[in-house]
Amino acid sequence: MNENEKPQITEQKENQSALDQLIKEKHELLEHLRQLKAQFENYKRDSLREKEQVLKNANEYFLVKLIPVLDDMERAFEEVRRSKSYKNFYSGMEIIYKKLWKILNDEGLFKIEPKEKFDPFEHEAVERVETDEKEEYSILKILENGYKFHKKIVKPVKVQVAVRPRGENGAKTE
């Protein structure tokens, strides 16, 4: 071997050693990445399972509160069958209705109290009535109640609204 080849061989050995080290690090990083990916998949699966369990628990909590209302209704129906009197049944149903509303209010459900004027954020106009007797977009009639769950509207109030009469050709009359 001549003098020029020795540094080249040393340099090749160093390069090979560095390459081997990089390959080893690459395999370690790929293995670590594979483990992280598996851990993340497990986390997603566990999170989904936990969310489902929380939902089941919330539903169970709410439904257990409704069981006494069902029991009261069964007793009311039995009372009507037994006594053939609807007077007691009606007063019993009123009590049950109030009890149910108390449970629903405690859970955050409230009936929307409609205003006199149409509000597109709380109302759904399902009927329009042409009239000069009321201000335009006044609510003439509540067709179905609306509800809020906490502050979110879950069902708008369905209403009948007043609109100005239109002329024969479809244009508004002045």
Curated annotation (Swiss-Prot):
One of its GO terms (molecular function) is adenyl-nucleotide exchange factor activity. SUPFAM superfamilies: Coiled-coil domain of nucleotide exchange factor GrpE, Head domain of nucleotide exchange factor GrpE. GO terms for biological process: protein folding. Keywords: Chaperone, Cytoplasm, Stress response. Its main location: cytoplasm. It holds the Pfam family GrpE. One of its GO terms (cellular component) is cytoplasm. Participates actively in the response to hyperosmotic and heat shock by preventing the aggregation of stress-denatured proteins, in association with DnaK and GrpE. It is the nucleotide exchange factor for DnaK and may function as a thermosensor. Unfolded proteins bind initially to DnaJ; upon interaction with the DnaJ-bound protein, DnaK hydrolyzes its bound ATP, resulting in the formation of a stable complex. GrpE releases ADP from DnaK; ATP binding to DnaK triggers the release of the substrate protein, thus completing the reaction cycle. HAMAP family: GrpE. PANTHER family: GRPE PROTEIN, GRPE PROTEIN HOMOLOG, MITOCHONDRIAL. Belongs to the GrpE family. This is Protein GrpE. It comes from Pseudothermotoga lettingae (strain ATCC BAA-301 / DSM 14385 / NBRC 107922 / TMO). The gene is grpE.
